[in-house]
Amino acid sequence: MDSYNYRDFAVGGGLLQRIRLVVSGSLHCGESDATLNDPKHLPARCVFQFSGPDNNSVTFPIEYVLRLMKNWARSQCDPYIRIQNTGVSVLFQGFFFAPPNAPMASITSEHNNVILKSTHTTGLALSGIERVKRGGGLDLRPLQAMMQISCFTRMPVVQLSFRFMGPEDASRTQRLLERATSFGAMELHQKRTVDSCDRSNGIVSPREHRECRERQKRRPTPKRCASEVFASLASISSAFASERVKRRPVRIAAAILAFVFVAVILAIATKGRLF
């Protein structure tokens, strides 16, 4: 009998908790058919479900939920969300693998509306969302375009609108992506340097290997580099300011002397003309 692994259970509980946080509060979370105990052994049955009552309009972040499931898993999977009109409510069910004969919504970037009559079912997998993005020429980078489902429940019909929502501030998102890329490149360079030190352990002397490791430890992180740059700029600006303060009396005295000299010259010239 396998022992109870609290860490694995906590990881699965954390995934479900995050999904509950991003799903609309007007959707009721129901009991699932399977528990999440091991990200390496994924269940084939339903792992979560949400239902919405009649006369209700909600937004379901389908792509974000599917990517949460994909990132949590430690084995190959293609997460799938099934949407059903039960006749009294709309039901969202999550699977790590699409069930046999699972319906797939035939949507494109131009035709993104689906109407479900009573007891009818549709669904969409993460691979299907990526295919729609490529077909519509949308940006495939993270945070650029995320699919959401606008669900309008008016029994006996449920209307679904699959829409891509972009970031609120595209320039800020671009800066975040560039910053993450630059920091990732720096960390990769440092890791490669450390790995080269480790690989050279059997080639160079222990002293040289120790010095290589010490240099890597003393190397400042990108955050420290940025802070040092800002500190140096601040010190330079303060030095310039203090220098300007020191030179101010000298400049004032020089201006007064120049004014007196000009006045004397003008006075002498005026007297010469009078006489």
From Swiss-Prot:
InterPro entries: Herpesvirus_viron_egress-type (IPR007626). Residues 197-221 are annotated as: Disordered. The keyword Phosphoprotein applies. The keyword Protein transport does not apply. Phosphorylated. Residues 273-275 are nuclear. Residues 1-251 are perinuclear space. The chain crosses the membrane at residues 252-272. Keywords: Host membrane, Host nucleus, Late protein, Membrane, Phosphoprotein, Transmembrane, Transmembrane helix. It is found in: Host nucleus inner membrane. Pfam families: Herpes_U34. GO terms for cellular component: host cell nuclear inner membrane; membrane. It is a single-pass membrane protein. HAMAP family: HSV_NEC2. Belongs to the herpesviridae NEC2 protein family. Plays an essential role in virion nuclear egress, the first step of virion release from infected cell. Within the host nucleus, NEC1 interacts with the newly formed capsid through the vertexes and directs it to the inner nuclear membrane by associating with NEC2. Induces the budding of the capsid at the inner nuclear membrane as well as its envelopment into the perinuclear space. Forms a heterohexameric complex with NEC1. This is Nuclear egress protein 2. It comes from Equine herpesvirus 1 (strain Ab4p) (EHV-1). The lineage of its organism: Viruses, Duplodnaviria, Heunggongvirae, Peploviricota, Herviviricetes. The gene is NEC2.
